Curated annotation (Swiss-Prot):
One Pfam family this sequence matches: MscL
Compartmental location: Cell inner membrane
Family indicated by similarity: Belongs to the MscL family.
Lineage: Bacteria, Pseudomonadati, Thermodesulfobacteriota, Desulfuromonadia, Desulfuromonadales
Protein name as catalogued: Large-conductance mechanosensitive channel
Organism: Pelobacter propionicus (strain DSM 2379 / NBRC 103807 / OttBd1)
Length: 145
């Protein structure tokens, strides 16, 4: 059983999958930082110095100035600012994956199949296709040798 597991784990597909998951996790962190630290601050500034991560609806009756205060008090909140950031995060990831798949598919396009050696030739007199071994054309009856 251990031998079977070793063969399974060493098989190329499993290793490729593991590498893909590791790279995907790291790429996800990069995109997350891009959204939170690069994209959302200018968008928030354009919209009146708004920090999207701090946008929330308080579902309890008590007033809280910030999301951190509401969380500290244990109040029920609807954190739509964080949700907006997550949607932007997802859209960027989906677009990048789309571009990667598109490029991979473009590189994968199969080359045209080589033309197989023909088993016929054209008659020099009537230009009809005839077998390579033919000594007389079956169409015009010309002698080919």
């Amino acid at each position: 059983m251990l031998k079977e597991f070793k063969e399974f784990a060493i098989r190329g597909n499993v290793i490729d999958l593991a590498i893909g998951i590791i790279i995907g996790g790291a790429f996800g962190k990069i995109v997350d930082s891009l959204v939170k630290d690069v994209i959302m601050p200018p968008v928030g500034m354009i919209m009146g110095k708004m920090d999207f991560a701090s946008l929330f609806l308080n579902l309890s009756g008590t007033e809280y100035a910030t999301l951190a205060e509401a969380k500290k008090a244990g109040a029920a909140t609807l954190n739509y600012g964080i949700f907006i950031s997550t949607i932007v995060d997802f859209l960027i990831m989906a677009f990048v994956v789309f571009l990667m798949v598109k490029q991979i598919n473009r590189m994968k396009k199969e080359a045209p199949a080589p033309v197989a050696a023909s088993d016929s030739k054209d008659c020099p007199f009537c230009l009809s296709p005839i077998p390579l071994q033919a000594t007389r054309c079956p169409h015009c009856t010309s002698n080919l040798k």
